[in-house]
Amino acid sequence: MNVDWSFHFEEQFERIIATIVLAQSYEDGIEWHERIGGQISLLANFPLMGDNVPARCFTQPPDDLERLRQLIISPYRVVYEIVGEQCRVLAIVRCSSMLVRNELLWDK
């Protein structure tokens, strides 16, 4: 299975890593990049490893909530969907943040 990242996810991920580098260290940024990227790469072989995203995680749940899955890489939540032979990584947010449904659309 192919694992692809949306532009929205890429922007969020870059911001998170940049924040870690500024607040902590370059080495911590690299460590988090590898940790999160490594977990996401496992989706190629184990696309169902993430749980369904609970409705309570949304400001307003989408009508097609069942399509969304999540990987918890504490303190972050990576949201993805499976479409055919493609695993689409849609967003990454802190677990304490509510998800906004219009930010979970495929944009590539």
Model-derived segments and spans:
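Basic, Lys/Arg-enriched alpha-helical interface segments
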Residues: M1-L68, K108
